[in-house]
């Protein structure tokens, strides 16, 4: 695979080309969706500020150090270590760390921001147990429990449901189940926080969800063992990846292998599909280079917005 580097001008031109592809390949569905541009005016909610602070400080560390303090808690590993997310003092990135799965990471972000020691006081273990049904013996709800709670957000204090990808704002949480036969062990699904809506990106893979869908790309914050993107997936994958990167993928210029995947908390990009007619969630794709997309019927999706007060 080549090490062709895209200039900012080239990258913007490539993005413009992608927009043209979207408009040409999916004119009817894009027109029906009335896709708005990204809105820079939404203020980041407090929990997004806290999540990004943690990720950004960890990113300032060398890769070798990040690998020791920013880790995904893979099932069966780290039996003697509890899930944790630690925020340090300003200017001390070495004091920040993560050892978590997707749901425990975002639960700890909410607990830090709105928990008993905050000005808000509601995001406690008791709250998550009552409204997101934390399983006996567990400290955090699973992604599956979050998805169920978001789907019933009208009955969940401090959350309101978001049923359409086009309405997602920075800080909103989106959870989806994995296949029904695999929703108990070891992983039930995945949950992410929206960082920014990036626009749409059409692909032949979209047809796996349906012929009348709109593929919205979102930059997200999450904790995962599988970064969102594979720059080595195909001859064209590197250029696309550079437009929609993941902070957990390390590049080795001029070396073999050229890329190393890391895990833990970071930023990536995911595709959420909307039905062009109803605007409701229709499915998702893990990243813009993924060759597989999943329908919402196959893997249910629900999203919610946090209201601090």
Stretches found by the model and what they are:
Residues 35-133, 274, 279-309:
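N-terminal capping segments
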